A protein has these predicted regions:
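Basic, amphipathic alpha-helical hairpins
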Residues: 3-10, 14, 24-37, 55-60, ...
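Basic/polar phosphate-binding segments, predominantly the helix-turn-helix DNA-binding elements
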Residues: 35, 39-71, 91-116
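The cytosolic transmitter module of two-component sensor histidine kinases
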Residues: 18-22
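Terminal helix-turn-helix DNA-binding modules in bacterial transcription factors
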Residues: 23-31, 58-97, 119-131
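…primarily DNA-binding HTH/wHTH and HhH modules…
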Residues: 7, 12, 17, 104-131
């Protein structure tokens, strides 16, 4: 069955709308952003990864990866403003394993390093552990 924007997709004997798939993908991002995977949504609904990806892009104008990165960066920025967690803890918490990659994405989005962002937004430098 070919899916169009307003017609349901038959899967596992049930009708699933594109909107339901997109909402499930967005829910995966907001509730499981550290380990979010579009594969989870595809598996849950019994559809292909490519199909869910296409639905997300068609409905939001962005790829799943772009939406996930946006949510992770916004969460990291909020934690930098509102917590005294160190930057490495925040990087891990929001789901990045590669620190350099996180720093690059953060700088591209906010024009500052995470440390600079925290300093500018809170007016205080993070506490350093004493030896």
């Amino acid at each position: 069955m070919v899916q169009t924007k307003n017609f349901p997709l038959e899967t596992r004997g049930e009708a699933v709308s594109r909107e339901a798939l997109v909402q499930a993908a967005l829910k995966e991002i907001t509730q499981n952003y550290r380990e979010a995977s579009l594969s989870n949504v595809a598996r849950e609904y019994g559809v292909s990864l490519a199909y869910v990806s296409e639905c997300v892009r068609a409905e939001t104008g962005r790829t799943y990866k772009e939406l996930l990165q946006k949510h992770r960066m916004e969460t990291a920025a909020r934690l930098l403003r509102r917590s005294d967690m160190n930057i490495q803890q925040i990087i891990s918490l929001v789901g990045y394993e590669n620190t350099s990659y996180f720093y690059r994405l953060f700088h591209e989005r906010y024009g500052l390093s995470p440390r600079e962002y925290r300093l500018v937004r809170t007016g205080t430098a993070p506490r350093r552990p004493t030896a």
